[in-house]
């Protein structure tokens, strides 16, 4: 949507780069966004999109992105739809870290790999996990992973063994789960060292399984 009004205090904040009239995309879940819908213009069932006339309120802490000028609106929205995960993939790793990405062939996985590769640098490692071996060559060609392994993310021991083998036997600093199926929680947790980070982006995540599983393995 188009920015209609900005609070005076926020306008004065150093580094704030928005102005009224800018076209932006909110990266905050609609379940957390105060939204007033005045009119529904169209419903696009094929792409899960609804065009409306209305107003939304974004708070200072909200993630957002300016609409790019060099791509179409549908393409930009498709890329930004999973922007929460790549934003964390940029924020969480440090230079030289090892990162494991489950669901490496999906849109969110590829974008996470791209951001993580830039952040960890040449001394770090970003390993993707896919289920289909046919996906490996294309992902390596894209250059978004240092290595891609084949494993079933619903089988934690299988994933752990393959992941550690791809990281010279070492546990990972960070794992990001982008798999859109259930029961992948332990596959994201097991390969990570004590005090490491596990980021669950998938909406299929059971945080009960994640919490109890992590507690159970110690």
Where are the model-predicted features located?
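Mid-domain Rossmann-like dinucleotide-binding core that forms the NAD(H)/NADP(H) cofactor-binding site
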Residues: 69-152, 205
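Short amphipathic alpha-helix with an adjacent loop that forms part of the alpha/beta core around
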Residues: 156-170, 190
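NAD(P)H dinucleotide-binding glycine-rich loop of Rossmann-like/cofactor-binding domains
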Residues: 24-96
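Glycine-rich beta-strand-centered segment in the early N-terminal region that forms part
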Residues: 1-31
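Hydrophobic beta-strand signal
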Residues: 24-25, 100, 199
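Local beta-strand N-terminus motif with an aromatic residue
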Residues: 96, 145, 169-173, 216
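Glycine-rich phosphate-binding loop and adjacent beta-alpha segment
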Residues: 179-218
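Conserved "cap/hinge" positions at secondary-structure junctions
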Residues: 7, 28-29, 34, 103, ...
């Amino acid at each position: 949507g188009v920015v209609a009004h900005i609070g005076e205090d926020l306008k004065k904040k150093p580094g704030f780069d928005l102005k009224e009239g800018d076209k932006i995309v909110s990266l905050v879940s609609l379940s957390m966004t105060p939204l007033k819908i005045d009119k529904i213009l169209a419903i696009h069932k094929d792409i899960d999109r609804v065009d409306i006339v209305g107003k939304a309120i974004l708070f200072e802490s909200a993630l957002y992105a300016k609409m790019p000028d060099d791509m179409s609106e549908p393409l930009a929205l498709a890329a930004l739809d999973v922007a929460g995960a790549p934003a964390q993939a940029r924020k969480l790793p440090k230079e030289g870290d090892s990162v494991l990405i489950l669901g490496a062939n999906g849109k969110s996985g590829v974008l996470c790999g791209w951001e993580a590769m830039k952040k960890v640098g040449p001394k770090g490692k970003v390993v993707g996990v896919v289920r289909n071996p046919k996906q490996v060559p294309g992902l390596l060609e894209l250059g978004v992973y240092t290595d891609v392994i084949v494993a079933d993310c619903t089988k934690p021991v299988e994933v752990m063994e393959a992941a550690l083998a791809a990281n010279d036997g070492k546990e990972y600093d960070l794992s990001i789960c982008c798999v859109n199926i259930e029961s992948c929680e332990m596959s994201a947790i097991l390969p990570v060292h004590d005090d490491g980070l596990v980021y669950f982006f998938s909406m299929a995540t059971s945080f009960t399984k994640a919490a109890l599983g992590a507690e159970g393995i110690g």
